[in-house]
């Protein structure tokens, strides 16, 4: 960043501080990851200069012959990665991918069945503060109070009762596998479209470690970061028959020009995900997640559902008389980054919460194995059981620094 350092030291300094934070902290936010240097290079390329409204071979601007190559690579790699007939890599985010699907097949006021946000769903699955809840009549399904897992009989009952035009499966804070085949059966029974939002688990799906929703869903949406370890962005996968409608829904429906530098980075990330090393990485994610859950529970920390099948876990803080807001702050002070999170049947406000969400995708990228992640679990539990003990917190902070120093991040930057 030689030019930036010379021209705009304020921005340069802020970026360097953020790099220092990422290096020094144990990153456990489930929606975050560390992209490769080559993904960052693509993001910072001259492709950021190019307007390319439309699609490869059908642009509204001249001079698109080379960005066409990049977008075709991204689409082809995405289709290969997930076994899809159609891919649209232009959505700027997962939220816009979801919006485009809704825009393509729903009318304002249509009924949609989606997962309750506090039970693990997402804002774009019908939250009243989100466009989805404003434009469409969302009705909810959730998890059982005893198991904290999805009960497909209850989902079916809700579908039969409300007769939705679409069912949305997928979650932002659900630690167990989702059975997309069962969702397909329910959707077929009521004549509904099925959209799966696999944003959090896309990398695990690509690695064959979670059921692939593409064969079951009419529409599959995802972000391209999180476990897929690409740039921040979105994508839609579907059968070829939906190409024209979905393409129009993205452009000119809800977006203008695509971000060609981001699409290039998506292509690079998809190429990485097609390599055997990526499967090895995702297998380590699962091992780390299970080890973290096991370690926390061994130290009297309540993990919802008793464990995890993916990259994340939810910790219930009520037995410790703590709030997510307080724990997030104290953990951050000792160098462990998490986010406060609502838990099913929440009694606190979304700004306070009774839980935290913890994910291992980023630290696994960094090289953490089961031995390292067990240390992380011990550190978290020590904080939770000694949240006002300054001596313990200082000791944890020092051990966090020792651990992160053992796993250097971006040494060439």
From Swiss-Prot:
Q: Where is the signal peptide?
A: none
Tell me the superkingdom of the source. Answer: Bacteria
What this protein catalyses is: (6R)-5,10-methylene-5,6,7,8-tetrahydrofolate + glycine + H2O = (6S)-5,6,7,8-tetrahydrofolate + L-serine
One annotated GO molecular function: glycine hydroxymethyltransferase activity
User: Per the annotation, which location comes first and is thus the protein's main one?
Assistant: cytoplasm
Binding residues annotated for (6S)-5,6,7,8-tetrahydrofolate, in chain numbering = 117, 121-123, 349-351
Annotated localization = Cytoplasm
Kindly tell me the pathway this chain contributes to: One-carbon metabolism; tetrahydrofolate interconversion; Amino-acid biosynthesis; glycine biosynthesis; glycine from L-serine: step 1/1
PROSITE patterns for the chain: SHMT (PS00096)
Q: Return the EC number.
A: 2.1.2.1
Question: One GO CC annotation, please?
Answer: cytosol
Where do transmembrane segments lie in this chain? none
| Modification sites for N6-(pyridoxal phosphate)lysine | 226
| Gene3D superfamilies to which the protein is assigned, alphabetical | Aspartate Aminotransferase, domain 1 (3.90.1150.10), Type I PLP-dependent aspartate aminotransferase-like (Major domain) (3.40.640.10)
User: Subunit comment for this entry?
Assistant: Homodimer.
Q: Please give the PANTHER family that the UniProt record associates with this protein.
A: SERINE HYDROXYMETHYLTRANSFERASE, SERINE HYDROXYMETHYLTRANSFERASE 1
Report the sequence similarity comment from the record.
Belongs to the SHMT family.
- Which function does this protein serve? Catalyzes the reversible interconversion of serine and glycine with tetrahydrofolate (THF) serving as the one-carbon carrier. This reaction serves as the major source of one-carbon groups required for the biosynthesis of purines, thymidylate, methionine, and other important biomolecules. Also exhibits THF-independent aldolase activity toward beta-hydroxyamino acids, producing glycine and aldehydes, via a retro-aldol mechanism.
- Name of the molecule in the record: Serine hydroxymethyltransferase
């Amino acid at each position: 960043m030689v030019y930036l350092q010379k021209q705009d030291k304020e921005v340069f300094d802020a970026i360097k501080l953020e790099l220092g934070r990422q290096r020094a902290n144990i990153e456990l936010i489930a929606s975050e990851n560390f992209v490769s240097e080559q993904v960052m290079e693509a993001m910072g390329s001259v492709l950021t200069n190019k307007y390319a409204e439309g699609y490869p071979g059908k642009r509204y601007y001249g001079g698109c012959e080379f960005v066409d190559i990049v977008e075709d690579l991204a689409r082809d790699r995405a289709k290969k990665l997930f076994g899809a007939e159609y891919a649209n890599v232009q959505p700027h985010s997962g939220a816009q991918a979801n919006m485009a699907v809704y825009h393509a097949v729903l009318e304002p006021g249509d009924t949609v069945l989606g997962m309750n946000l506090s039970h693990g769903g997402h804002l774009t699955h019908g939250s009243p503060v989100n466009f989805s809840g404003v434009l469409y009549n969302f009705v909810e399904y959730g998890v059982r109070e005893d198991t904290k897992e999805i009960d497909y009989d209850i989902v079916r009952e809700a579908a039969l009762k409300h007769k939705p035009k679409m069912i949305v499966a997928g979650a932002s804070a659900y630690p167990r596998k989702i059975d997309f085949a069962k969702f397909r059966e329910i959707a077929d029974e009521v004549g509904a479209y099925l959209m799966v939002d696999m944003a959090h688990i896309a990398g695990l799906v690509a690695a064959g470690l979670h059921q692939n929703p593409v064969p079951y869903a009419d529409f599959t949406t995802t972000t391209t970061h999180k476990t897929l370890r690409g740039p921040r962005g979105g994508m839609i996968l579907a059968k070829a028959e939906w190409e024209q409608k979905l393409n129009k829904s993205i452009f000119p429906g809800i977006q203008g020009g695509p971000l060609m530098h981001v699409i290039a980075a998506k292509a690079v990330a998809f190429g990485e995900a097609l390599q055997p090393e990526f499967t090895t990485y995702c297998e380590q994610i699962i091992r780390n997640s299970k080890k973290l859950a096991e370690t926390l529970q061994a130290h009297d920390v309540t993990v919802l559902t008793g464990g995890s099948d993916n990259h994340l876990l939810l910790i219930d803080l009520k037995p410790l008389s703590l709030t997510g807001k307080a724990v997030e702050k104290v953990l951050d002070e000792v160098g462990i980054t998490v986010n406060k999170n609502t838990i099913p049947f929440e009694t606190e406000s979304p700004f306070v919460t009774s839980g935290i969400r913890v994910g291992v995708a980023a630290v696994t990228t960094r090289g953490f194995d089961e031995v390292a992640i067990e240390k992380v679990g011990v550190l978290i539990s020590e904080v939770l059981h000694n949240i006002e003990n300054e001596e313990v917190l200082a000791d944890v902070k020092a051990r966090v620094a020792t651990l992160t120093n053992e796993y250097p991040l971006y040494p060439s930057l």
